[in-house]
Amino acid sequence: ALLAHAGYKVYVVEPNKERLDVIKTGRSFFFEEGLDSVIKLALQSGTLIPTNSYEESVPDSQVVFSCVGTPDNPDGSSNLTYVFSAAEETAKLAKPATIYVQKSTVPVGTGRKIEALFQELNKKLEYVSNPEFLREGTALSDTLFFDRVVVGGDNQAAVDTVMDIYMN
């Protein structure tokens, strides 16, 4: 919502209908101080577009941020089902040179597996890791007043593009 508020055209792909309906009303489906007003303003300006469709959002996107849940498995390891599902859905629809930014906290080596998935699907996407450092209840201020941004990838131009988004 903050990137949309900054003027970027942002699609929010939310497969859960109840959550999507909440976002469409200008609210968050979880409490975060100040977030509802940011969502509402971005919706009103037309820069935030909530959808359940990768088909609507991915083909025209130059940069795709993947921010999905990584719940714990019973053994305590991260369940990466949503991470790989989002990467696959994006890869199927993205144009070449689309920058795919992984925001979710994932184990070391996950990025290489996502890159292998892109190769397996014969897609030339640029993978960038950009883990978020957000605390529940203060995520909005953590995003606005960050003390560091960690961005990494094999393609320097893709990394620079992601950094430019933060600096604007």
Language model features: what each stretch is:
Residues 59-60, 96, 146:
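Alpha-helix C-terminal capping/helix-to-coil transition sites in glycosyltransferase folds
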Residues 1-28:
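NAD(P)+-binding Rossmann beta1-loop-alpha1 motif at the extreme N-terminus of oxidoreductases
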Residues 56-57, 93, 143:
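Structural alpha-helical scaffold elements that stabilize or flank donor/cofactor-binding regions
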Residues 114-128, 139-168:
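Internal alpha-helical scaffold of NAD(P)-dependent oxidoreductase catalytic cores
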Residues 66-68, 104, 153-154:
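Glycine-rich, N-terminal phosphate-binding loop of Rossmann-like dinucleotide-binding domains
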Residues 71-136:
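Rossmann-like NAD(P)(H) cofactor-binding subdomain of soluble oxidoreductases
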Residues 35-62, 72:
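A structured beta-alpha segment of the ubiquitous adenosine-cofactor-binding alpha/beta core
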